[in-house]
Amino acid sequence: MLSRSSFTSLAVGVFAVYVAHTCWVMYGIVYTRPCPSGGAAACVWPYLARRPKLQLSVYTTTRSNIGAESNIDLVLNVEDFDIESKFERTVNVSVPKKTRNNGTLYAYIFLHHAGVLPWHDGKQVHIVSPLTTYMVPKPEEINLLTGESTTQQIEAEKQTSALDEPVSHWRSRLTLNVMVEDFVFDGSSLPADVHRYMKMVQLGKTVHYLPILFIDQLSNRVKDLMVINRSTTELPLTVSYDKISLGKLRFWIHMQDAVYSLQQFGFSEKDADEVKGIFVDTNLYFLALTFFVAAFHLLFDFLAFKNDISFWKKKRSMIGMSTKAVLWRCFSTVVIFLFLLDEQTSLLVLIPAGIGAVIELWKVKKALKMTVKWQGIRPKVQFGASNDSEKKTEEYDTQAMKYLSYLLYPLCIGGAAYSLLNVKYKSWYSWLINSFVNGVYAFGFLFMLPQLFVNYKMKSVAHLPWKAFTYKAFNTFIDDIFAFIITMPTSHRLACFRDDVVFLVYLYQRWLYPVDKSRVNEYGESYEEKPKKKSS
């Protein structure tokens, strides 16, 4: 059976292979092999190299397929379209009755020769995108005491929201790109991701690909959606354009496919939106750094969970450990998980919080020496007795909590009362969870003081799970970076920086009380807690 060090080495090795493989895959995505100079017959040449005069036209229709210019509306026409110049224009779009009744409205974007109608141009390229999507409206927040709402919504919208059913929303942004590189493809090995966006034409003896028109679906964010009701007749649409390189185009196609796959696996529109935000709102170079940071975060999460579980699994006594701090960590972790769940936070944050809550519940069972015996169908919970050494630790623990309660309880109660009077919530449950979590975030570090006090009284920190602490500290510093990237509640973001301060205090105590693991303390125990070897 693998030892702990071997298992850790194996995990780190697998992690290194994973990172190397991912880097190789990413290189394969952004790098495209050009057509060799000697194989001109098999090359696919760019039509844009001829520098044609182009025009951009955007139409809307309720039909997913159009054969001619009937039943379509022209909403934007850009003559003398320059593929090198970015622009952004806002137009008003008429909303048909069919769309107002939860129907779909499509945008047809044509790139064609200037002065020629799209359906009369044999070398036009076009792409289709729905301008509507279906999503459950965000619950309205009200003042729980007065019933005053944050927004004056139309009564029909309130009734629709109450049904908790998806309704039609308007995508107010349309982001377009054209691949502008004069890149010569090898016809025998066209990249599959780009190939589906390419349209070929035969010009003389050579094959050319027409301009590659692309819609950036990653820019469609939940914050830009607008609810469509029966009285809506016109809505704004912001059309923006920018050129794109081949490498970024291929990367963006893969990211869009990944987001689509997440939605097929059950991710909601909001969950997918969190992932989109990582790519759209972040510089690509910073995004590459974020990938490596996220990979290390995953590794440290795994190692922290593993070492924490290993430490508590072998823990035979609570000497030097604050039981109340363990109980508090369990309570705060569960409350934070429920809060993140209520706020519909990204699964990237929610899943680790849920795993952490389960581990903290198990640690409480170990700390209280709790056993469950079944008497028929009725469970009977029993708690183990504490020895004299553990009672001494509990005495320090109780002493710290006594003074702490004088400060903590008034602050938490006052904060909850203030938020009830001045802040609007979706429900009483939402207020209760928010009050708890604000207490956890704002004053939670105070509950770490009992453990610091126990360390001070015992003049030792050898009883703490330092390996798990170290991995968690690394993740805390990584969380500081993610706090500016991943969408999360502001209080959760501030808590990341609070944990930095707490860990620095633990480091100071470790320096102040050097650990001698071979030393037997005043209770006759070694903090190494090595299992006794059986005599042969």
Swiss-Prot record:
Any one of the GO CC terms: membrane
Reactions it catalyzes: a 6-(alpha-D-glucosaminyl)-1-(1,2-diacyl-sn-glycero-3-phospho)-1D-myo-inositol(in) = a 6-(alpha-D-glucosaminyl)-1-(1,2-diacyl-sn-glycero-3-phospho)-1D-myo-inositol(out); 6-(alpha-D-glucosaminyl)-(1-octadecanoyl,2-(9Z)-octadecenoyl-sn-glycero-3-phospho)-1D-myo-inositol(in) = 6-(alpha-D-glucosaminyl)-(1-octadecanoyl,2-(9Z)-octadecenoyl-sn-glycero-3-phospho)-1D-myo-inositol(out); a 1,2-diacyl-sn-glycero-3-phospho-(1D-myo-inositol)(in) = a 1,2-diacyl-sn-glycero-3-phospho-(1D-myo-inositol)(out); a 1,2-diacyl-sn-glycero-3-phosphocholine(in) = a 1,2-diacyl-sn-glycero-3-phosphocholine(out)
GO molecular function: phospholipid scramblase activity
InterPro entries for this protein: CLPTM1
Domain of life: Eukaryota
Membrane topology recorded in Swiss-Prot or TrEMBL: Multi-pass membrane protein
Entry's localization field: Endoplasmic reticulum membrane
Glycosylation sites recorded in the entry for this protein: N92, N102, N229
Coiled coil: none
GO biological process, any: apoptotic process
Keywords on record: Apoptosis, Endoplasmic reticulum, Glycoprotein, Lipid transport, Membrane, Transmembrane, Transmembrane helix, Transport
Side of membrane Extracellular, spans: 31-284, 343-346, 424-428
Membrane-spanning intervals of the chain: 10-30, 285-305, 325-342, 347-364, 403-423, 429-449
UniProt xrefs under Pfam families: CLPTM1
Predominant cellular place of this UniProt entry's protein: endoplasmic reticulum
Residues exposed to the Cytoplasmic side: 1-9, 306-324, 365-402, 450-536
Family from the record: Belongs to the CLPTM1 family.
UniProt function note: Scramblase that mediates the translocation of glucosaminylphosphatidylinositol (alpha-D-GlcN-(1-6)-(1,2-diacyl-sn-glycero-3-phospho)-1D-myo-inositol, GlcN-PI) across the endoplasmic reticulum (ER) membrane, from the cytosolic leaflet to the luminal leaflet of the ER membrane, where it participates in the biosynthesis of glycosylphosphatidylinositol (GPI). GPI is a lipid glycoconjugate involved in post-translational modification of proteins.
PANTHER family: CLEFT LIP AND PALATE ASSOCIATED TRANSMEMBRANE PROTEIN-RELATED (PTHR21347), LIPID SCRAMBLASE CLPTM1L (PTHR21347:SF0)
Protein name: Lipid scramblase CLPTM1L
Organism expressing this protein natively: Gallus gallus
UniProt gene name: CLPTM1L
